[in-house]
Amino acid sequence: MGQAQSDENSIPTTTTTNTPPPSANSPRDSEDTSSPSMDSLLAEAAAYGEDDNENESLEAKAQRALDCPCIADLRNGSCGSQFSEAFLCFLKSTAEEKGSDCVNPFVALQSCINANPDAFSKSVTGDEKETEKKEEQPPVQDHRIIPPLWAKDPPRSGNSKL
Amino acid sequence: MSSRENPSGICKSIPKLISSFVDTFVDYSVSGIFLPQDPSSQNEILQTRFEKPERLVAIGDLHGDLEKSREAFKIAGLIDSSDRWTGGSTMVVQVGDVLDRGGEELKILYFLEKLKREAERAGGKILTMNGNHEIMNIEGDFRYVTKKGLEEFQIWADWYCLGNKMKTLCSGLDKPKDPYEGIPMSFPRMRADCFEGIRARIAALRPDGPIAKRFLTKNQTVAVVGDSVFVHGGLLAEHIEYGLERINEEVRGWINGFKGGRYAPAYCRGGNSVVWLRKFSEEMAHKCDCAALEHALSTIPGVKRMIMGHTIQDAGINGVCNDKAIRIDVGMSKGCADGLPEVLEIRRDSGVRIVTSNPLYKENLYSHVAPDSKTGLGLLVPVPKQVEVKA
């Protein structure tokens, strides 16, 4: 299935400009003591870790997270390095909108995926559980839909305007 | 216990972290937006009645036109030039019909979601509602879908599926559900080059579909705010008798895929339904059934007006039946009348007025038709204009 083939996928690049000043304009926010969103997700997660070392730097924690075996497949795919950078940045993000300070690595990951649409397909990463055929095995449901006039075949006369 | 090659508790959190990373990445790729955290708790009962806020702004049908949507928020001072909420404690009601007739439907859904969260933090609130076009799309009635509308959903589906693949690679996460499950590969009597877009749209918007579930289940179908009742088409006494809370919950349950199958509850279908009714929004005042309106209003204690979208008012926002019916669909979308954005404002202390970007109503009535007339606060016209003759 041809995913991510359209150029429009990269549209978001143009919207990158306004990097938000962290929570600057929420006037009622002042008495919100906990404001958990200002912590990085990583710090949050680490707080629940069983053998967490309080003094470890965020950077070191993030690196350790990247070494976790369960993401080996993501890390080693053809967009592995872009993934690692984007994920690392996201983990460390302390922005109100998590990840909004990661536009560059996000865009890099997007471009890599656009260039390698199969970057994260199982088969590519050597995992062969892909034996299930890509047909639609579950019964096809009732999907009588009403298409727009312009999508009808054969085209209708009296073309309606869009 | 902790003696693996990576003796860290942090690995236990990785699946959760991957999941939120992937969601953020997909959101950004689809919309260009990073959503702030959602301050509202999930799954709370959909609220139907609200106290009258200090300031209430009502916005009409948006129909896939992001630029006009922005303008509508801007003229009411609700957002700044980078789309951040500046409305403070203002409450906003958008009366539905975000979908169809334009190609930026998802972008508007994201835009509204972001503002909802920002508003919530600032002590404000944004309600979004179901219009007939939301209901139609959930049902697979795509008559008013544009080509761009198919493309945008296709892009969403591609990124969404890619996100699912990434999650699948992370051991420890449940295998995500295939959004296309059960959707046919082709459709009779339809152009083959539309199949993919149509499939994406069905996947996204059918009951329990990811977009329907995420965004549309948060919509009210009816809402009472202070002395105003909001609904997309209109309410008859029988709807009120059926129960406003009940309507909201049932429609939401249907969109969630809990029950009811493909089609919406009966009061959302057909000419006399709450999202289709035009009895109170006919442009010609004399065609409006004021008696039925007054009867309906009298059955909701404390409510003195009904505010509706659905029927384009060429003359702008206006009221009929002694301003008991306020009609706010100005057809602003390029896919409709390309009308000038106007919104309704109700202040607790100073009553009802119209905020417009129409230069005609600007301070200097006859001076200039300024090219910048689209930005900034328009003149506030006192009390809804009574419009009897259509221009």
Curated annotation (Swiss-Prot), chain A:
Major localization listed first in the record, in broad terms: mitochondrion
One GO CC term on file: mitochondrion
Keyword field contains Disulfide bond: yes
Example of a GO MF term: protein-disulfide reductase activity
Alphabetized Gene3D superfamilies for the sequence: 1.10.287.2900
GO biological process, one term: protein targeting to mitochondrion
Disruption phenotype: No visible phenotype under normal growth conditions.
Cysteines joined through disulfide linkages: C68-C70, C79-C112, C89-C102
Segments of skewed composition (Basic and acidic residues): 125-145
A Pfam family of this chain: CHCH
InterPro entries the UniProt entry points to: CHCH (IPR010625), CHCHD4 (IPR039289)
Biased composition (Low complexity): 9-18
CHCH domain mapped to chain residues: 76-120
Compartment(s): Mitochondrion intermembrane space; Peroxisome matrix
Motif Cx9C motif 2: where in chain: 102-112
Keyword terms, alphabetized: Disulfide bond, Mitochondrion, Oxidoreductase, Peroxisome, Protein transport, Redox-active center, Translocation, Transport
Statement: the UniProt record of this protein carries the keyword Protein transport: yes
Residue window of motif Cx9C motif 1: 79-89
Region of interest (Disordered), ranges: 1-61, 119-162
PANTHER family: COILED-COIL-HELIX-COILED-COIL-HELIX DOMAIN CONTAINING 4
UniProt function note: Required for the import and folding of small cysteine-containing proteins in the mitochondrial intermembrane space. Involved in the mitochondrial oxidative folding of the copper-zinc superoxide dismutase CSD1, the copper chaperone for superoxide dismutase CCS, and subunits of the mitochondrial membrane respiratory chain NADH dehydrogenase (Complex I). Involved in the peroxisomal oxidative folding of the copper-zinc superoxide dismutase CSD3, and the fatty acid beta-oxidation multifunctional protein AIM1.
Name of the protein described by the UniProt record: Mitochondrial intermembrane space import and assembly protein 40 homolog
Organism in which the protein naturally occurs: Arabidopsis thaliana (Mouse-ear cress)
Gene name of the encoded protein: MIA40
Curated annotation (Swiss-Prot), chain B:
Swiss-Prot/TrEMBL keywords: Cytoplasm, Hydrolase, Manganese, Metal-binding, Protein phosphatase
Induction notes from the record: By infection with the bacterial pathogen P.syringae.
Cofactor: Mn(2+)
Domain of life: Eukaryota
Key word Metal-binding present: yes
Coiled-coil stretches: none
Location relative to the cell: Cytoplasm, Cytosol
InterPro entries given in the database record: Calcineurin-like_PHP_ApaH, Metallo-depent_PP-like, MPP_Shelphs
Residue numbers binding Mn(2+) 1: D61, H63, D97
Reported consequences of knocking out the gene: No visible phenotype under normal growth conditions.
Cellular component terms per the entry's GO annotation: cytosol
Short name of one Pfam family: Metallophos
Residues binding Mn(2+) 2: D97, N132, H232, H295
Tissues showing expression: Expressed in roots and siliques (at protein level).
Cofactor binding comment, as recorded: Binds 2 manganese ions per subunit.
Active-site residue list: H133 (proton donor)
Listed EC numbers: 3.1.-.-
Gene3D superfamilies assigned: 3.60.21.10
Keyword Cell inner membrane attached: no
One term of GO molecular function: phosphoprotein phosphatase activity
Broad class of enzyme this protein falls into: hydrolase
Family as reported in the entry's similarity comment: Belongs to the metallophosphoesterase superfamily. SLP family.
Free-text function comment from the UniProt entry: Shows phosphatase activity, hydrolyzing the artificial substrate para-nitrophenylphosphate (pNPP) in vitro.
The protein, known as: Shewanella-like protein phosphatase 2
Lineage start: Eukaryota, Viridiplantae, Streptophyta, Embryophyta, Tracheophyta
